[in-house]
From Swiss-Prot:
Location within or outside the cell: Cytoplasm
The protein, known as: L-threonine 3-dehydrogenase
Residues at which NAD(+) binds: I175, D195, R200, L262, G263, I264, I286, Y287
Organism: Yersinia pseudotuberculosis serotype O:1b (strain IP 31758)
Homology family: Belongs to the zinc-containing alcohol dehydrogenase family.
PANTHER family: L-THREONINE 3-DEHYDROGENASE (PTHR43401:SF2)
Tagged with keyword NAD: yes
Function, in words: Catalyzes the NAD(+)-dependent oxidation of L-threonine to 2-amino-3-ketobutyrate.
GO cellular component: cytoplasm
Amino acid sequence: MKALSKLKAEEGIWMTDVPQPELGHNDIMIKIRKTAICGTDVHIYNWDEWSQKTIPVPMVVGHEYVGEVVAIGQEVKGFNIGDRVSGEGHITCGHCRNCRGGRTHLCRNTVGVGVNRPGSFAEYLVIPAFNAFKIPDNISDELAAIFDPFGNAVHTALSFDLVGEDVLVSGAGPIGIMAAAVCKHVGARHVVITDVNEYRLDLARKMGVTRAVNVSKENLNDVMTELGMTEGFDVGLEMSGAPPAFRSLLNSMNHGGRIAMLGIPPSDMSIDWNQVIFKGLFIKGIYGREMFETWYKMAALIQSGLDLTPIITHRFPIDEFQQGFDAMRSGKSGKVVLSWD
């Protein structure tokens, strides 16, 4: 079958032929319709330090997808041939304390689809049936293909009560923009997003944020004054991994504020801990999606009117995958979807 693989320990990704994956007793096989390019896939393409430590070569990559069930393992119940599915990309062990306690997103033995085992940039993907999620009929293939990153946004945004709250989102990448849209949809008062990438900030404006602030040109304190805010933000979502953005977020939080962190800062990042301690801030780390509460919320949010379509900015047939990666690497894109149909 055709697949996009990391074939060499250098920059790039290559189309190749690989054997079709084998089906286990508890697995389903999915014929891929559409895939989306994740920031992780760009790291793998660039062959950065994290990729060099993590990714075995050769390896089929990709973990954002939608497809159709074409084969079912003999022990599988609840799925039928022809079901349209996406899937949770974190495969968990089922026997550690967190798995047995129902907190599977915190499994210490997590294996990543397209990171530690063959991924979805292929004609066929095999995953445990436990990880598959049926897509409702009124959700398009394109939106279903971005459920994985949308889930990161939903998990982060819904970490805290948002109704009537003022929210600051640092980092206007696709996940940050989707998180901001979720906050607005569920009843936050002001949702402000910051970045230095004007293309992405324009995208955030299309998604309905209160203010999209280019911090290289505009002062966040002035924006808060303009919005009539006198005490700082109630909720902060750190989506950038950039130390200056996180420090600015800490400075802008109200006392007792709550922060969810999805962005991954450098391990040696320094901050003013007085901002955390004397403000009584609560900081929560976010990894992946809650299984499967986040997935049900994703579907419900779209079905209740949340419009994510502006975040998908580029579409290519799979044979033009290089253009898709070029768009993602340029910084002038939202989500990029590749069609395998």
